[in-house]
Each structure stands twice: as C-alpha cells, then as structure tokens.
C-alpha cells in the first residue's frame, strides 16, 4: 500500500494537506495480468518503449484510479468503488498526483512499485 501526502489548493482557495491511499491486491494484479493478451506487464513495457505518450497518460490515469481507495477504520478493508474513484478524480489532489507521475519518471516508477502487493511472488 502506498500513502501519498499531498498539499493542494481546493476550489474554495483553501490550502489542504491530506493523505491518500493507493493499493492493488494480488487478485487485482492477477486480473490485470490475465486480462491482456501477453500480460499486462508486457503491454506496459511495450507502451513505455514505444514512447506513446497518449497511451502512457491513459494507462497512468487508469492505474491511479484503480488503485485509489480508503482504509476502513479497523484496517481490515481497503474500500474501492467507481464513485470513490470518480470523486477523487475531481479533486486538485488527483491533479497534483497525476501531474507528478506524468512529468517525473522516477515518481511514476515509485508509484507503480508502491501500489503493488509486497508479497506478489508468494
């Protein structure tokens, strides 16, 4: 699980600093891998090699929104829904994160590594 602390200015002009959480479960990663012929990781590698910026941006948006969620109070669940992802995508915090990933290769790689399950190979 990746926690990103983001400072942004909301639509009322108020500066906010908030924590946002991103995670992909083993099941989600497996589903992504099996949903693309040849595997998701191979497709990702090919897109990056091709320098298809439009596709890279589209893929990052998809990954950020798929990984976004909220931890339950007891820490047992990581709650995700289309509604939560859509609401998050309408914030300046999302815009800050998206721009960081779009403009900084190291930040993008750290994000992808951070959202992957720690024990994926096990």
PLM region spans:
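Short, charged/polar N-terminal "headpieces" of proteins
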Residues: 1-42, 108-122
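Generic structural signal for hydrophobic core residues of well-folded globular domains
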Residues: 47, 67-68, 101
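C-terminal charged interaction modules
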Residues: 72-122
